[in-house]
C-alpha cells in the first residue's frame, strides 16, 4: 500500500505529532506520550505502516509491553484494524515472556536443563515462610510475605549487588540474609521464579553470542510500550537485542512512572540519547481525555518535578468540567460526601494510594446496600502486623490470662522486660489464676520503672471492654504503651487511623473485632456488579484507565506524599518524593469531566494546596492583589526586582526552613513586610501589613527572589 492511501485510510484523524510518530520507523526513537494522547492507537497504526508501507515482514517485528493483558489487548486492536491474519504473524510479548523464549531456545540448542519455573502460589508462599522463620522469631503475616516478595523482585530487576541489597530501607529482618537463603533454596530445589527468567535470559544473551545472534536475526525492529515502567534489567535485555539493528521504538512518559517499588527505571528515558546516539525524541502532548481545567491543573503540578523532560499537556476537549475543591473538617467527611453523592445518583471513581483507604467507604456501602466495584487483589490490611497487634490487644483485654497473647504482646506495651520474666508471669498465672500483668508485678527481679508502669498499663487494658471501639483504640495508643512502641519502631500508624474510622461505627471493642471478621469475609466473597455506581481503586490499578468523575481520597501529607519536600535530605528522598508527585498526577489525569479534591485544614495536603494555588481563580486573585499592591506601593526597589517569568525550575528543592520559620519577619517584593504564621509542605502562610494572610509557594518566591527573611533564626 502506498503512503498516501495508507494515510487516507488509517491516519486521517491523527494530529501532526501522532503522524510523525507513525512514520518514524528506522533508528532509535523515543516517543514521550502524555496521558490521554492516543499512544496505543499510534503504536498500532505504526505497526501497520511498517508492514503495509515499508514492506517489513511482520515476523521481524517484536512488540513488548508491561502485562499479559496489555499484549492481548494490543493484538486484538491490531487485528481489528489490520486483520486477524496479519495479527497472527505479529509477535506481542511481555519481556518476561520473551525471556522464557530465550531460555527455551538456549536449553534446546545446548541440551541444558533449565530450572523449573515456580507456577504455584502455594509453593512460593511456603518457601518464603520457611526462609523467613530461619531468620526471624516472628511468624510472617501475609503483608510481611508480600513485602518480602516485593523486595526480592526489586533486587532482581535492579540487578543489585550485596552492597545495594544492604542499602535497601525495609522493616524486614536482615534482608541480605533472607535473599541469600531464598536464592540458595531455589538453587537446591532446581527452581526459578518469574524474575529469574529475566536474570538468566540476560546472562545467556551476554555469555552466548550464538543465542543473541539468533534473536537479532529473527527480529530487526523492536517496539516497547509503557517503557517508563520497564525495569533496569529489562532495559538491558532490550538494549542487547536491539543493539545490532538499532531499530528501537520506545513509548513512555517519565511523568507517569509510578512503579519504583517494582524497580521501574525511568532514568532510561532520561538517558535515551546517551545510550542510543543519534536518537530521535518525539512528543505527543495533546490530551484527548480531560477537560481544559483538569489538564491545566495537572500540567502546572507535574511541571514542578525536576527529573523529567519538558513537555506541555494541551487539552483538545475544551472546558468539559472543573477541578472541584471540597472543604472538609475531618477524614470522615470524605466518606460521607462520597456516599451522599452516590445516594444522589452520581457515578464516581474513587482513587487512593493504599487499598485500606477504601475500607471505611466499603463498610458504609455494605451497611447501606450500595453496590461498588473494588479491585482487592493486594488487600493485606486484615493480616497486617499492626492490625493483628490491635486485635490481639483487644482480645487480651478481654482474656487477661491468655499466655499465647501475652507472649506475643508484652514487649509492645512499653514493658521492655526479658523473656524469662514474661515466662515467670505465665507460670505464676497458671498456678494462681490471677491476670498475667498482675503476676508480672509480683516478679521478684522486675525493675522499679516497670513495676511503676504496670498498674497504668493494666488499668488501661481493663478499661477497654467498657468503652466504645473508638475510645478503646485511643486508649491502646495513648495509655497502654502501644503508640510509644510504634514510634520507637518507626512503624506507620496509618492502619490505626483506618481502624479508628471503622471503630467509629461500633459501640464496643468486641463489636469492632466482629465487624473486622465480617468485612474480611464480605470482601473475600465480593463480586463486582457491572452497574455499580461506585468504583474503588488504587491509583496504581487505575493506570491506563479513565473515568468521567474522579475523586482523590486520602491524599494527605504522610500518605500522599509519604514525606514532605522539606524533609528530603538525599537524592533518594527526592526520587521517592517525585514519584509521589507522579502518582498524584496520574490520579488527576484519570478524570475526563470532573476531578474532586478534598481540602482539610486539620489534615494538610501540600499537593492539593499546590493545585489550589494554581487554579485559574487563585491565579486571577493573586494577579489582582499584586496589581493593587503595586499601585499602592509605587515602583519596586531595585534589590527586590522580580525576575522574568521562568520555565519550570531547574534549581534544587528549597528547604523552607532556610528561608523562613514560624514567627519570622519577612519582606515580599509586592506585599511588603509581614510575619510567617505557618509552614505547610512547600507553602508559607504570611500575614502582611495590610492585615491579610496570603499562602505563597516557597520554592517559587525563593527562586525568583521575591521574599527575604529579615532576621536569622
PLM regions: where:
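P-loop NTPase Walker
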Residues: 1-112, 213, 296-299
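Short glycine-/polar-rich loops that comprise or flank the Walker A/P-loop
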Residues: 27, 56-60, 87-88, 244-247, ...
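Helicase P-loop NTPase motor core
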Residues: 35-43, 47, 277-280, 285-372, ...
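Conserved helicase C-terminal RecA-like lobe
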Residues: 168, 393-617
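Conserved beta-strand -> loop -> alpha-helix junction used to position metal-binding or nucleic-acid-contacting
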Residues: 87-102, 370-393
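C-terminal accessory regions
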Residues: 555-692, 696, 705, 709-713
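ATP-hydrolysis module of ASCE/P-loop NTPase motor domains
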Residues: 87-89, 108-196, 419-420
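Conserved helicase NTPase motor core
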Residues: 6-7, 12-23, 27-38, 62-63, ...
Amino acid at each position: 500500500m502506498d503512503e498516501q492511501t495508507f494515510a487516507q485510510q488509517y491516519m486521517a484523524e491523527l494530529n501532526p505529532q501522532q503522524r510523525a510518530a507513525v512514520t518514524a520507523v528506522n533508528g532509535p526513537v523515543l516517543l514521550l506520550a502524555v496521558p490521554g494522547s492516543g499512544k496505543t492507537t499510534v503504536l498500532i497504526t505504526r505497526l501497520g505502516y511498517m508492514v503495509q508501507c515499508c514492506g517489513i515482514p511482520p515476523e521481524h517485528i517484536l512488540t513488548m509491553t508491561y502485562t499479559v493483558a496489555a499484549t492481548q489487548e494490543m493484538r486484538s486492536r491490531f487485528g481489528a484494524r489490520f486483520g486477524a491474519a496479519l495479527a497472527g504473524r505479529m509477535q506481542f510479548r511481555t519481556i518476561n515472556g520473551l525471556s522464557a523464549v530465550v531460555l527455551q531456545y538456549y536449553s534446546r540448542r545446548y541440551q541444558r536443563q533449565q530450572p523449573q519455573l515456580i507456577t504455584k502460589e502455594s509453593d512460593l508462599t511456603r518457601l518464603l515462610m520457611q526462609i523467613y522463620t530461619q531468620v526471624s522469631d516472628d511468624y510472617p503475616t501475609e503483608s510481611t510475605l508480600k513485602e518480602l516478595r516485593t523486595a526480592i523482585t526489586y533486587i532482581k530487576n535492579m540487578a543489585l549487588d550485596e552492597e545495594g541489597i544492604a542499602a535497601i530501607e525495609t522493616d524486614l529482618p536482615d534482608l541480605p540474609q533472607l535473599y541469600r537463603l531464598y536464592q540458595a533454596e531455589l538453587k537446591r530445589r532446581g527452581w526459578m521464579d518469574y524474575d529469574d527468567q529475566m536474570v538468566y535470559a540476560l546472562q545467556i544473551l551476554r555469555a552466548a553470542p550464538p543465542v543473541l545472534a539468533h534473536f537479532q536475526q529473527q527480529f530487526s525492529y523492536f517496539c516497547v510500550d509503557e517503557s517508563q515502567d520497564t525495569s533496569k534489567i529489562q532495559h538491558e535485555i532490550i538494549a542487547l537485542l536491539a543493539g545490532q539493528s538499532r531499530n528501537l521504538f520506545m513509548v513512555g512518559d517519565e511523568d507517569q512512572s509510578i512503579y519504583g517499588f517494582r524497580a521501574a527505571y525511568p532514568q532510561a528515558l532520561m538517558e535515551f540519547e546517551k545510550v542510543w546516539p543519534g536518537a530521535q525524541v518525539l512528543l505527543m502532548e495533546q490530551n484527548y481525555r480531560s477537560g481544559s481545567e483538569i489538564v491545566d491543573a495537572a500540567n502546572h503540578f507535574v511541571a514542578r518535578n525536576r527529573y523529567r523532560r519538558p513537555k506541555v499537556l494541551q487539552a483538545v476537549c475544551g472546558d468539559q468540567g472543573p477541578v472541584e475543591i471540597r472543604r472538609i473538617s475531618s477524614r470522615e467527611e470524605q466518606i460521607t460526601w462520597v456516599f451522599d453523592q452516590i445516594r444522589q445518583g452520581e457515578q464516581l471513581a474513587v482513587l487512593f494510594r493504599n487499598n485500606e483507604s477504601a475500607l471505611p467507604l466499603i463498610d458504609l456501602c455494605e451497611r447501606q446496600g450500595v453496590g461498588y466495584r473494588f479491585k482487592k487483589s493486594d488487600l493485606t490490611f486484615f493480616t497486617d502486623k499492626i492490625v493483628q497487634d490491635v486485635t490481639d490487644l483487644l482480645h487480651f483485654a478481654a482474656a487477661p490470662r491468655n499466655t499465647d497473647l501475652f507472649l506475643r504482646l508484652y514487649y509492645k506495651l512499653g514493658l521492655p522486660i526479658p523473656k524469662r520474666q514474661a515466662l515467670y508471669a505465665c507460670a505464676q498465672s497458671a498456678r494462681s489464676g490471677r491476670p498475667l500483668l498482675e503476676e508480672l508485678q509480683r516478679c521478684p527481679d522486675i525493675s522499679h520503672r516497670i513495676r511503676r508502669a504496670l498498674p497504668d498499663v493494666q488499668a488501661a487494658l481493663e478499661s477497654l471492654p467498657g468503652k466504645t471501639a473508638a475510645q478503646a483504640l485511643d486508649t491502646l495508643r495513648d495509655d497502654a504503651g502501644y503508640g510509644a512502641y510504634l514510634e520507637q519502631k518507626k512503624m506507620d500508624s496509618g492502619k490505626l487511623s483506618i481502624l479508628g474510622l471503622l471503630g467509629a461505627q461500633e459501640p464496643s471493642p468486641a463489636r469492632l473485632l466482629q465487624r473486622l471478621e465480617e468485612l474480611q469475609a464480605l470482601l473475600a466473597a465480593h463480586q463486582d456488579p457491572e452497574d455499580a455506581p461506585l468504583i474503588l481503586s488504587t491509583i496504581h490499578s487505575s493506570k491506563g484507565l479513565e473515568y468521567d468523575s474522579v475523586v482523590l481520597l486520602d491524599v494527605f501529607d504522610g500518605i500522599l506524599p509519604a514525606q514532605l519536600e522539606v524533609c528530603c535530605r538525599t537524592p533518594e528522598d527526592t526520587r521517592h518524593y517525585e514519584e509521589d508527585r507522579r502518582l498524584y498526577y496520574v490520579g488527576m489525569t484519570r478524570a475526563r469531566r470532573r476531578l474532586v479534591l478534598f481540602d482539610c485544614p486539620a489534615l494538610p495536603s501540600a499537593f492539593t494546596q499546590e493545585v489550589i494555588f494554581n487554579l485559574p481563580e487563585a491565579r486571577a486573585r493573586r494577579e489582582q492583589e499584586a496589581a493593587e499592591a503595586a499601585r499602592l506601593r509605587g515602583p519596586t526597589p531595585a534589590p527586590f526586582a522580580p525576575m522574568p517569568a521562568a520555565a519550570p525550575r531547574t534549581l534544587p528543592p528549597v528547604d523552607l526552613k532556610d528561608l523562613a520559620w514560624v514567627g519570622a519577619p519577612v519582606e515580599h517584593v509586592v506585599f511588603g513586610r509581614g510575619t510567617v504564621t505557618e509552614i505547610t509542605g512547600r507553602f508559607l502562610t504570611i500575614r502582611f501589613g495590610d492585615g491579610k494572610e496570603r499562602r505563597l509557594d516557597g520554592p517559587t518566591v525563593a527562586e525568583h527572589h521575591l521574599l527575604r527573611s529579615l532576621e536569622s533564626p
